[in-house]
From Swiss-Prot:
It comes from Shewanella denitrificans (strain OS217 / ATCC BAA-1090 / DSM 15013). It comes from the Bacteria. Disulfide bonds: none annotated. Belongs to the SlyX family. This is Protein SlyX homolog. Transmembrane segments: none annotated. InterPro entries: SlyX.
Amino acid sequence: MQELQQKIEDLETKLAFQELSVEELNQEVIKLNQLVAKQQQQISLMVNKLMDIEPSNMASESEETPPPHY
């Protein structure tokens, strides 16, 4: 009977540590999700800023005169 009680206590201890680990991992996942959301927002803002930049005066590749060897 004593052995069974010891096994139960060991299992309860392991369960408590696992619950703590799961909670810590959950908090990390929440932080990472927030970070990803912030980075997505920043990327979106950067894309919008890049699209607002006026095109340069340089001709595009399709408008360039081919080099003389063509």
